[in-house]
């Protein structure tokens, strides 16, 4: 399990490597100690100590008749009244103060950089705006498990545009119903991008809830149709994920199994400067998809389905090509961008090797940040 000192050491190690760390924030519900409505003391150091009472629980919780509950019903918009634990009443001032103290403590005392809010269909998402306003995280994403892009857009607005959300619309409509089934028209304006909200989209193919954890489970229900052992399918999906605007989240089991291929895709995305608001030109029919994605330093061309057999586009370098997918990139003539945003005048042949970007100019070799290697 570890302790707070070991956690602090771990976070410091991540930060020393230039990484930022998110806390998994579960504030929709809380487990009890023994009876229906007895809770642990919440000690958040300088941000306060809280002694949760049964009156902090929503009045339509399963604990009805077991103890005295709060004044308000659950205000969740999608998955209200979580059955396995007590539901906090986020309209209750004490609960609000506790959650604000908790998020500030996580960020400023424990030194997490941001938050992944769990089970956000269980309480009104406007509360996320309140808690983020208090804590000011570097990054925030909410788990609102709905596959409708219009509803996700509405929830982002209700949260004051003060958080991103996992793009379940892309997961279900583009990956499950589109690429998995080679119905490539569903790649057009996929997910929140189709609503002009790609900057608020954390895009993903699978997560710990949707992933088939065993061969028997995979065969039995396909867990939304994905199979990590279908290499062509997984690489088609990841090529789309890592080419498109949004904040892509690579599923760790995919990374472990296909590290070499995914490294090349990530390097190409970085080289071209694809970002959460990159523009996309795209065309598709049922059997194929073609797109050009514009970055700050170049472009990516993505071909799926029968389009993968196209000839290499002029002026582009091949990143990776396989069964029903091909990915190419180019960069601007003036080289690449450094970490601090300065431009370098490194010209020459750009290529990807072992997942890393390099630039060769005569006898000189530079890395992807324009630093001379030899």
What annotation goes with each model-predicted range?
Residues 61-68, 296, 331, 362:
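Extended, charge-rich alpha-helical regions
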Residues 11, 15, 19, 23, ...:
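Active-site-proximal helices and loops of the catalytic beta/alpha 8
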Residues 33-97, 159-174, 202-204, 212, ...:
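Glycan-binding loop/region signatures in secreted carbohydrate-active enzymes
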Residues 1-82, 88, 123-142, 147:
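Acidic/aromatic-lined carbohydrate-recognition and catalytic surfaces
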Residues 86, 239, 289, 348-349:
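Residue-level detector of beta-strand structural context in well-folded domains
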Residues 334-374:
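C-terminal outer-membrane/trafficking sorting elements
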Residues 3-4, 95-96, 230-231:
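A conditional alpha-helix N-cap/helix-loop micro-motif detector
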Residues 81, 234, 284, 342-344:
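Short solvent-exposed loop/turn micro-motifs enriched in small/polar/acidic residues
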């Amino acid at each position: 399990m570890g302790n707070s000192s070991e956690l602090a050491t771990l976070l410091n190690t991540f930060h020393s490597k230039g990484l930022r760390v998110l806390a998994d924030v579960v504030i929709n519900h809380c487990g009890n100690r023994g009876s229906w409505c007895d809770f642990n003391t919440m000690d958040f150091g300088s941000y306060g100590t809280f002694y949760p009472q049964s009156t902090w629980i929503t009045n339509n919780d399963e604990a009805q008749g077991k103890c005295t509950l709060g004044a308000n019903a659950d205000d969740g918009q999608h998955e209200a009244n979580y059955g396995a634990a007590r539901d906090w009443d986020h309209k209750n001032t004490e609960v609000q103060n506790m959650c604000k103290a908790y998020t500030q403590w996580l960020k400023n005392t424990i030194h997490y950089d941001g938050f992944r809010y769990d089970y956000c269909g269980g309480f009104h998402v406007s509360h996320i705006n309140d808690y983020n306003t208090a804590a000011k995280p570097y990054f925030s994403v909410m788990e609102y498990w709905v596959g409708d892009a219009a509803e996700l857009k509405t929830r982002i607005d209700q949260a004051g545009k003060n958080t991103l959300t996992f793009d379940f619309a892309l997961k279900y409509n583009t990956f499950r119903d589109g690429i998995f089934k080679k119905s490539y028209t569903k790649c057009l304006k996929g997910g929140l991008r189709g609503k002009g909200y790609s900057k608020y989209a954390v895009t993903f193919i699978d997560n710990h809830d949707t992933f088939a954890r065993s061969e028997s489970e995979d065969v039995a229900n396909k867990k939304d149709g994905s199979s990590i052992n279908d290499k062509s399918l997984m690489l088609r999906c990841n090529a789309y994920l890592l080419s498109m605007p949004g904040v892509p989240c690579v599923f760790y089991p995919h990374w472990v199994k296909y590290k070499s291929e995914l490294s090349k895709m990530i390097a190409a995305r970085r080289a071209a400067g694809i970002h959460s608001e990159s523009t996309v030109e795209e065309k598709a029919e049922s059997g194929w998809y073609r797109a050009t994605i514009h970055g700050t330093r170049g472009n990516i061309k993505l071909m799926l389905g029968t389009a993968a057999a196209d000839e290499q586009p002029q002026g582009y370098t091949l990143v990776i090509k396989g069964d029903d997918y091909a990915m190419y990139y180019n960069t601007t003539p003036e080289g690449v961008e450094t970490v601090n945003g300065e431009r370098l005048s490194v010209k020459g042949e750009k290529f990807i090797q072992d997942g890393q970007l390099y630039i060769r100019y005569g006898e000189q070799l530079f890395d992807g940040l324009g630093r001379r290697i030899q």
